[in-house]
């Protein structure tokens, strides 16, 4: 598996059905039967499978279907809205197994944790499997499935997760900052331009007490992570 391709996707809706991830083939067969009987307009031809993790709803840890065309009648299908966020897209050779890329994806997320985090939906981790024209029924040596890992950006000043549009700061021209949160950056400038790294760490500690056993643990972790952030990188 190579390094991922970064893609920024707009919000889109998948129409389909949910089911048991342990019975994937049966879920797909049921969806295809339903779609054959009552098709809906697709936004594009690729099929999608969304897998959820840490899911307490038994039997509803996958969602399969197609992207719904804008304004199309969904009929009797369920819908799942995927957010407009960046995705890290990994290619996985089907013959090596769908889980064969997990270690590479985990390592990439760990190596880039100062820039990105894995986005959750309603408290659950998820990944989108896309079946494009490169997926050749899974029985060819070069058959590929794309694994789309949804991401949020990390503020490059205070490391706050920026998971929604309101979290981002503003550039001087009013456009959203790609790097800094609304608390650190406004109108193209830092709110406290003379702030030191240590001062930033101390100001962040009261907001993350749930993540650490005590202030010293928080301080030690931030001292290890913050120098990698864009504002503080040497």
Label for each model-derived stretch:
Residues 168-178:
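Short linker/helix segments within small regulatory modules
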Residues 155-158, 181:
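Short cysteine-rich clusters marking metal-coordination/redox-active sites
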Residues 159-160, 184-188:
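Cys/His-coordinated zinc-binding microdomains
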Residues 159-169:
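Short Cys/His-rich Zn2+-coordinating modules
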Residues 1-154:
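A solvent-exposed interaction/effector surface
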Residues 164-165, 190-193:
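Short, non-ligating residues that shape and space the ligands of small metal-coordination modules
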